[in-house]
Amino acid sequence: MRSLLTTTLLILSIYSNAQKNPTTTELVMSMSQRSLVMPGYLPDLKALIARQAYEFWKEGNVEPYVSHLNVYQALYEANKYLGYDSVRNMAYNQVGMHSNTVTSVVFGSDPNFYYSSSTDGKVLKWDLTSPRSIPETIYESDKIVQSIEMSNDGKVLMAILYQEGLALISTEKNPHEDIKVLEDPQPVQTATFIPGERKYLTVAKSGELILKGFNTKSEQVGKTALKINQLKVDEQDGTIYAGTEEGVLEAWEKPYQVKESPIEDIMENWRQQSYFGYKLGSFSINCLDISPSGDILAIGRDRGDIVLWDIPKKQLIRIISGHQSTVTDIQFNPKGDLLLTTSRDGTARIWDLTDSRKLPIILDDHDEWVFTGSFNPSGTQVITGGGDEYIRTWPVDPSYLAFRICAMINRNLTQEEWDEFVGRDIPYSMTCSD
């Protein structure tokens, strides 16, 4: 795994300073690492070692900022080889029906279904309750689907076509009728829905921001000379945020006024400053999201970092560094305490925003760049997609992975295995007791 060496070094660095029951912490880390390096042709043993490490982690007085990361990775890798489809070379949490890069994944109003888009020109609808079922093709084009967005009510899906226009696709299908699709042929840089309204906002290739409605006249609400990568509209006050290729974050506040760019670079005052010796500079802004509380704007940049911006105070909160390449997508979970990021470094990461000392959970199983990620509506799962054409589902809570191991295996560690991988001085117990 690409991130395993870096992760291990981080773990060892933090562990060297751990003062809280180092014996248990060391045992959990050692067993997790041994499970990770155990070959896949010993799936039961690999899984039982990971599950027992989880039991020690859950029950013991373990150093909290290290072990959760190791435990999650070991549990995930162990689960990967339980029920592995060697014919199709696919793990239990992996599906693939796109023939090219997966560019977006989004959920609608029904938490059991999600949608994906690809450079192959298709938009597919997937059933989470039946992951091996064939997805429904709800839209198909000979153009590249740059991204998709869902309206707040979950009734309309927007497919943004690269260097082209967009398609508005009804998700409410009558079984006796074809899926309704409304085409907007005007070429756009990007687009988004207006929260709470039956309107959407586009950025024309010439830079005009145009507000459009299903039954209303189009209205220009802004203009920019910069290349816009993504739009985000604040649900609370209607402010439009635009992340640009030039690294400028523009904003249009209500009442909207058509002005020449730049409208407002809200990061201008600190762009040349340092943050813990870290030069901020100007790097392309690729993705934006606003926290459920409406107080924080998360900004993903080409540098591989995430800027957290205090919206009411208009000031920097902190910068999160960890990705080795461009951040491609970003999303808060429904509670606003976790942040999901994806990157061209081939990983997705889940960051705990309540404690900056906690290492992120690193989701490292894609073979290419990871372009998109999304929490499910309950925040219990993450869906990711990328350049390897596959979509993967990840539980946020490692307890699900631990439970699946015992559901898939009908044995426990033998005494000999316990002595080898746990320790002769530690009393034997059943890893899967139920």
Question: Across the structure, where does each feature detected by a protein language model lie?
Answer:
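WD40-repeat beta-propellers
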Residues: 105, 123-127, 167-170, 209-214, ...
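A short beta-strand motif characteristic of beta-propeller blades
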Residues: 90-95, 132-138, 176-182, 217-223, ...
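Eukaryotic protein-protein interaction scaffolds centered on beta-propeller repeats
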Residues: 19-103, 267-275, 283, 358-364, ...
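Residue-level detector of Asp-centered blade-edge/turn motifs that repeat once per structural unit
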Residues: 109-110, 152-153, 195-196, 235-237, ...
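WD40/WD-repeat beta-propeller blade N-cap
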Residues: 94-102, 139-145, 182-188, 223-228, ...
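Conserved strand-to-loop turn within each blade of WD40 beta-propeller repeats
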Residues: 117-119, 161-162, 204-205, 243-245, ...
